[in-house]
A protein has these predicted regions:
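Divalent-metal-activated hydrolytic enzyme cores
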Residues: 135-151
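C-terminal helical cap(s) of enzyme catalytic domains, especially alpha/beta-barrels
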Residues: 104-138
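Catalytic alpha/beta core domains of metabolic enzymes, predominantly
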Residues: 1-105
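Generic signature of intrinsically disordered, low-complexity segments enriched in small/polar residues
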Residues: 98, 113, 127, 143-144
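Short amphipathic alpha-helical patches
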Residues: 21, 83, 110-114, 145-149
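Short, electropositive alpha-helical surface patch
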Residues: 86-87, 119, 151-152
Length: 152
């Protein structure tokens, strides 16, 4: 049986452990894998519920480039007012999609009420997103760096 499997990041910022989960599931014969980045637990909850530590999913992309990576801005932010800017940041960083918590009446939700948005707000957020097209490949960037070095 080959069904889609989405694997959330580990609670602690441990890329090797996260990659190990993909390897184990893949070795069991399940090949339709994707990642969900929900941020990482921290004692410091001043801004985010879970620290984004964007470098970890970026490194995951570098190590497993064919793996779709989705961002969960609801769990990273922990507050509905952070969902929109985190959605845009995830898109700017090249994530493949978003998983956003939505509820018709978020304040009455049984769990995670503070981080949920209404379907109308979600529609508004999604319509505001700027999806940037890749304009440079890694090869092009290398060529540009060489040109800069040559001119220095």
């Amino acid at each position: 049986m080959d069904i889609p499997i989405l694997i959330k990041n580990t609670v602690n910022p441990d890329l090797e452990l996260w990659i190990g989960a993909f390897e184990r599931i893949n070795n069991a014969g399940l090949k339709q894998l994707g990642a969900i980045h929900r941020g990482f637990s921290s004692y410091d909850k001043k801004i985010y519920r879970n620290l984004p530590q964007w470098h970890i999913p970026i490194e995951l992309r570098r190590r497993i480039p064919e793996l779709p990576i989705f961002c969960d801005p609801s769990h990273i932010g922990g507050k509905r007012e952070l969902v929109a800017p985190l959605c845009q940041q995830a898109m700017d960083l090249g994530f493949d999609g978003l998983i956003v918590e939505s509820h018709c009446n978020p304040d009455c939700a049984w769990s995670d009420a503070a981080q949920q948005v209404t379907p109308d707000v979600l529609d508004y957020i999604l319509n505001l997103l700027v999806i940037r097209k890749e304009t440079q490949t890694t090869e092009n960037m290398g060529q540009l760096r060489n040109q800069i070095n040559d001119s220095d």
